[in-house]
Amino acid sequence: MHVISKSALPPFWAKHPASKGPLEAWYKLVKAGLYKDFSDLRRTFASADYVAPYTVFDVAGNNCRIIAVIHYNRQRLYIREVLTHPDYDRWSKLYRSGKI
């Protein structure tokens, strides 16, 4: 799968150095994968959630979240946000209230 906006990862791990290894491992797995749909993706990323239209990945032992949009037919994953768990909680609250 082609990952768009990988450039969002280094600034995050610069602020949160412990996340660098897990984020790099996540990137390698996604890049190497060919996923036909969300169910197929969950075989590799069991903790991924679909929050329409986003796919949310738990990374680094639930310490950070990657919010992405995936076009399975084009094999493209667009990183929209890389957040800490508390920042994701705030994002989720805004999402549920329709502000995102």
What do these predicted ranges mean?
Residues 1-63, 71-76, 85-100:
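Basic, Lys/Arg-enriched alpha-helical interface segments
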